[in-house]
Amino acid sequence: VTTPRPFPTDVFSDVLAANGQYVGAFQDSGLTGFARQGLAIVTCMDSRIDPLAIVGMKPGDVKILRNAGARVTEDVLRTLVLATHLLGVGRVLVMPHTDCRMAKGDESDIHRLIAERSGVDTTSIHFATVSNQQDQLVSDVAAIRGFELLPASLVVGGAIYDVHSGKLSTVSC
């Protein structure tokens, strides 16, 4: 058991100040956890991606699941079970993107880079790098479609988001 540390207010002062302004203009108190548009998006954590803007939606419309590389992991599947059975999701868009670091090298490259930059041995972690984005997208979509705890009626599609043009390019999966 560790002793709780005080919140590092000085390091997060910009975040807390912005939240104060957000609270003053907040108008979403009537939203529920239900996805109004019945959509979940699995995408990357890359800060160039604004999932709601990309698909023309707003808060309350979509469930957004993010991780490095937009990979369909065990945790993504767990979350989709909740989203489909309890929160109104009937369709899933798996949306990796161009210029993704997870698609620019293999596991050993990532481990080596982290070790060089930080001196940390990360070989105990599997980063789920991607050697071919399109092939991996097809495989990840298939993983959702084949997961026995998800509804058979769930519609799943894949598209690659271009971070330089903003365009979604659909992929036959």
Predicted regions located by residue number:
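Short helix-loop-beta junction
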Residues: G56-I64
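Short hydrophobic segments within beta-strands
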Residues: V42-C44, M95, A159
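Gly/Ser/Thr-rich loops at beta-strand to alpha-helix junctions
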Residues: M45-R48, T98-M102
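Divalent metal-coordination and catalytic microenvironments
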Residues: N19, I41, L65, V94, ...
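N-terminal short beta-loop-beta anion/metal-coordinating cradle
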Residues: Q21-A25, G30-M57
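Ordered, amphipathic secondary-structure segments that act as subunit-interaction surfaces
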Residues: L87-H97
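Pocket-edge structural micro-motifs
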Residues: T43, R66, S172
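Divalent-metal-activated hydrolytic enzyme cores
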Residues: V1-A35, G69-D75, L82-L87, R101-C173
